[in-house]
Swiss-Prot record:
It holds the Pfam family GCV_H. InterPro entries: 2-oxoA_DH_lipoyl-BS, Biotin_lipoyl, GCV_H, GCV_H/Fam206, GCV_H_sub, Single_hybrid_motif. Binds 1 lipoyl cofactor covalently. GO terms for biological process: glycine decarboxylation via glycine cleavage system. One of its GO terms (cellular component) is glycine cleavage complex. The modification N6-lipoyllysine is found at residue 58. NCBIfam families: gcvH, PRK01202.1. Keywords: Lipoyl. This is Glycine cleavage system H protein. Belongs to the GcvH family. The glycine cleavage system is composed of four proteins: P, T, L and H. SUPFAM superfamilies: Single hybrid motif.
Length: 120
């Protein structure tokens, strides 16, 4: 299940763990990414809380926790090569994995069609 937020994050659910990243739209708006800061594994995040930072030559932008949960894994490759987040944001450029407190909360987020209309 793939869902999107109005802050331009995407989540892909596998069981009760969601992989989180920025959308292609957000990556396009930011331009070339030069720095990525990710949350610590084990961190408890609350929906709406700043969880990560992506920085481009244009601007630094917070990435917000789309839902509440615990960080189970971070993408160290994204830290080592921030440009990968911009070139493959919904693939190899994922940011972190979040064990959701309530996986059913995914239903509150936008599906791909709704996000496409929102991002226009």
């Amino acid at each position: 299940m793939l869902r999107f937020t109005d802050e331009h994050e995407w989540l892909r659910l596998d069981g009760d763990v969601a992989t989180v990243g920025i959308t292609a739209h957000a990556a396009e708006q930011l331009g070339d990414l030069v720095f990525v800061e990710l949350p610590k594994v084990g961190a408890k995040l609350t929906k709406g809380e700043a969880a990560a930072v992506v920085e481009s030559v244009k601007a630094a932008s917070d990435v917000y926790a789309p839902l509440s949960g615990e960080v189970t894994e971070v993408n160290e490759a994204a830290v080592a090569d921030p440009a990968s987040v911009g070139t493959d944001p919904q693939g190899g450029g994922w940011l972190y994995r979040l064990k959701l407190d309530d996986p059913s909360a995914m239903d509150e987020l936008m599906d791909e069609a709704a996000y496409a209309a929102f991002a226009k």
